[in-house]
Design a protein with these regions (language model features):
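Short, charged recognition helix plus adjacent turn
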Residues: 8-13, 32, 43, 58-66
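Short, basic-rich loop-to-helix N-cap that marks the start of a DNA-contacting helix
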Residues: 37-47
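Recognition helix of helix-turn-helix/homeodomain-like DNA-binding domains
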Residues: 25-38
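Short basic helix-loop element that most often maps to the first helix and adjoining turn
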Residues: 3-22
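Residues in the helix-turn-helix
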Residues: 18, 29, 58
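DNA major-groove recognition helix of helix-turn-helix
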Residues: 34, 44, 52
Length: 66
């Protein structure tokens, strides 16, 4: 998930802080999702996809979402 999440966020020209604010989580938590320290809940994973406007499911391949 890490590389794809960073790639899609940067294409949308969003910072980690902006993502965290839109998801109503801390920047530390969001950064943890990107670097693989934390795994998002299914609810947060779906919200990440929504915020990024990402339609494909493969943004979360090879991760422990849920």
């Amino acid at each position: 998930m890490r590389i794809k999440l960073i790639e899609v966020r940067k294409k949308k020209k969003l910072t980690q802080e902006q993502m965290a604010q839109r998801l109503n989580i801390s920047r530390t938590t969001y950064t943890g999702y990107e670097n693989g320290t934390f795994s998002p809940s299914l609810e947060i994973a779906l919200e990440i996809k929504k915020v990024l406007g990402y339609k494909k499911d493969d943004i979360f391949l090879n991760s422990n979402v849920g």
